[in-house]
Amino acid sequence: YKRQDNKEGCKMIWRSQIVLAEGLLDFYLHEVSKYCMFQMFCGNWEKSPKYDSFLVPMSKVEEAVSVASSNEWFFEYLNHRFSRDVFLSVESMRDQLNLIGIGFIPVMVKAFPRDKEEISKKDGTKIVEELFRRRNEIAHQNDRSHETAVQTDITRDFVGVYINNIECIVNAVDERIEEKDLNI
């Protein structure tokens, strides 16, 4: 970097890439949630325990019965139901992946393979926690620590690892969906 402005400009772009990447992951999880829920709804996939206890208001049931030939109500309802949800924290991602029948632990095992499943689960959970924590610090606190208010440094390499971790999660979700589609 020849000038300090360029270095700081790069860091702002890298921070933006982090927030964008997490936003894309959240959008992806919303979209695959609709697909997976529909597969269970149609009987193409085994229903998850969380699917069986998924609450739907009677007004939506009435709408579904009145337009039995259309599935539009189903996607409209899921869009509305999930519209305020963010699936990026460990808890919300775990709940959502379990709801849609592909499971948090199997996704973490595929995304972050280690010698033992327990280590994959632990490492995957830690990675998802770190992804969400850093994204929130950037998006809501200008990448500053709660404790010190000092801005956390960021590098191009960090962003590469960060985005690679997101890609590993997405690829693992895709693989789990493909396995379900093929009844593997």
Which role fits each region the language model picked out?
Residues 1:
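Conserved small/polar residues in nucleotide/adenosyl-binding loops
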Residues 110-184:
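Polyanionic, low-complexity intrinsically disordered segments
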Residues 20-21, 28-121, 128:
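Helix-loop junctions and short alpha-helical segments
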Residues 10-37, 163, 167:
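Short, hydrophobic, well-ordered secondary-structure elements
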Residues 4-16, 73, 107, 114, ...:
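Alpha-helical context
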Residues 5, 9-21, 25, 119, ...:
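Conserved aromatic-histidine-acidic binding/catalytic patches
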